[in-house]
Amino acid sequence: MSSTEPAPAPAPEPAPAPAAAPAAAAAAPKGMRKNGKNWHDVKTPFRPTKGQTSYARRLEERKAMAAIKEKEKEMKEEKEAERQRRIQAIKDRRAAKEEKERYEKMAEKMHRKRVERRKRREKRNKLLNS
C-alpha cells in the first residue's frame, strides 16, 4: 500500500431501532431531580385518551362488561336462592317442632285416640286450605 492511496472507509454501523430509543430514554433518568426524590417515576404531560379507542373496540368492551355483569347477577341469584332454601328449611323444622310440642301438651290433657283424631282433622283442613 502506498501512502497516497486513501484508506478504505469502515463499514457504517446500523442505527439502533427508533422504537428502542424512546423506551431507553424514558427508562434512563435525566440527572438528579430538583427535589431529590429520585425513587418517584418521571412525570409525563397529561394526554387525554378520549378519542384514541375505536368504536368497535368500545363495543367489544361493553359486550364483555355486560357478560360479566350478567354472570355476577346469576351467581348472586343462585347464592340468594340457596340462602332462602336454608332459611325455609329452618322455619319448617321449627314449625314441625312446635306442632309436635303442641300435640304432646294436648296428649297430657286428653285421651290418646282423641288427640290422633284431632291431628287427622287438622291435617285435612290444612290440605284443604292450602
Curated annotation (Swiss-Prot):
What residue spans carry the Basic and acidic residues bias annotation?
91-109
| Localization per record | Nucleus, Nucleolus
Explain the purpose of this protein: Involved in nucleolar integrity and required for processing of the pre-rRNA for the 60S ribosome subunit.
Start and end residues of each stretch annotated as Disordered: 1-55, 91-130
Residue stretches of biased makeup (Low complexity): 20-29
Question: GO CC annotations?
Answer: nucleolus
Fetch the Pfam families from UniProt: Cgr1 (PF03879)
Q: Which InterPro entries match?
A: Cgr1-like
Q: Which keywords does this Swiss-Prot/TrEMBL entry list?
A: Coiled coil, Nucleus, Ribosome biogenesis, rRNA processing
Q: What is its main location?
A: nucleus
Q: What protein name is recorded for this chain?
A: rRNA-processing protein CGR1
